[in-house]
Amino acid sequence: MRSRLAVIFRQSFRPHIITTGITTGLVTGYLFSKYKSTVHANTHANVIIGERMPSLPIYSMSEVAKHTTKESGYWLAYKDGVYDVSSFVENHPGGKQILKTAGKALESCWKIFTIHQIDHVYETLEQYRIGNLPKGEREANEKHQETVLDLFQYDPERVNANETFFIRSQRPFNAETKPNLLVSSFLTSVENFYVRNHMHVPVVNINEFKLEIRNEKSSRSLSYDDLVDKYKSHTITSAVQCAGNRRAAMNNEHQGAALGTQWYVGAIGNARWTGVKLRDLLESFGLDKEGEHVQFWGLDCDTSQRCYGASIPMEKALSEDVLLAYEMNGELLSSDHGYPLRVIVPGTIGARSVKWVNRIIVSDKEADSHWQMSDYKILPPSIKEPQQADFDRVPALQESNVQSAICSPSSDEDGNKIKVLSVKPSDKDKRLTVKGYALGGGGRAIQNVQISLDHGKTWFQAELEQLAQPHMRAWSWTLWTYHINASDIPSKPFDIVCRAMDTHGNTQPDTPLGIWNVRGVMNNAWHKITLQIDDSFLKKAKELK
């Protein structure tokens, strides 16, 4: 048995239980965040959101707690305010998600997910205002909120995170790798690998951990040691990419904002994953010949046991390389990356590679989690707000698409904010070196990466660094390099764009306009950066002439 003493000692405690509707707070805030009500209770202008309004009646939290059904209406509390959101729930697709938060105060949820602390979320909620809480109950809710914040106290310490990542949110922690670090090595180190968390990082006692595998008829479980020691290990090199990578580039004045974490190009990484083939596990329990889907559920749950979950088709689950991984680049998984066990579904969007997995369910149905049923889907461009969508009619995303991005030259400044980047060619060979990554998605290999300096009129082939991989099992990314002679570089600002083509002839669209969707997923348009040659280099070159 391999040694795991360090991890056992580090993680052999469990946090105290904290009561909160953490997941529902995220979903509720997301639904409110873009919807402007046309049918509402009382609208009160010139009022600070959630503050006491003497003209309105008083309702206690015990009264609010009674309103959790269609018959009684759906009530919520926020600060001193009481809100009846029944019409929102009943009249708008997606409103049913609020049912899980009905009868409660929202502070605990929204304090954790600070993305909802914006004016138009509060303003929309205020349109449903019907009353006030009694004096003292707001304070009680806020005291409870202070306890809820302890939920994140067991998150791992992230030393020097600002040097490595562009941090998109602290709670939950979401951070993308700075571009220059992405292309500094073919394998992305654990320390440099992007982090996408949907909730807090769970603490696991490895001595008590059990992996449950079940279908509708039976349930079995394995300890961590049983899984690692009794099943043959398998290693693959695979990129993992968030479906929202490059989301920020989809924002435009004509079509509107792409909602979600505003990733630049760094929500991707490439690593060697070691674990047990999911196929071997299912076969050992006789679960490989039934069910249409395999669901994965993680330990990142609220205390109502609403956990992060996703699913993949059975056909994919039984393929050669889907893993229950316990090692990343030859080391035990870190806490942020799913210790002790995570799913790796190569060629598929990162949302399906569930971290901290402790339940696997073979079923005829997809996972019924919010992230499978009402997120990570490409909505039609006519949908400007998620509340307009009938999510049941839109399939859940699975395979990634062909992708490429420019990572060097780059800056420590957030790429979303840079308009023009000042660069200096090498004094040694008088060339400007451009580097980036490409990924085929779905197991398709990258055939070529091309660079253009004139907005796509002419193209040049980049040099590729890639693994030899089996047909339709090209899970690893490709790194590419292109050198521009200084004599070919204009003195004024100029654009560089890149595009990739896979072995099936799939390539990238020139702009995001034709693939825009309100959730900003699967943006694989040409990546463009604007450069300006450093004045000192131009001056020196002029003197040499």
Language-model segments: what does each one mean?
Residues 235-267:
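Short, conserved helix/loop micro-motifs enriched in His/Cys and acidic residues
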Residues 265-277, 286:
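Mid-length scaffold segments of soluble, non-membrane domains
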Residues 136-212, 216-222, 229-231, 271, ...:
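Extended, aromatic/histidine-rich regions of cofactor-dependent oxidoreductases associated
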Residues 2-174, 238:
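Histidine-anchored, small-residue-rich loop motif
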Residues 82, 105, 116, 245-249, ...:
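Solvent-exposed loop/turn segments at secondary-structure junctions
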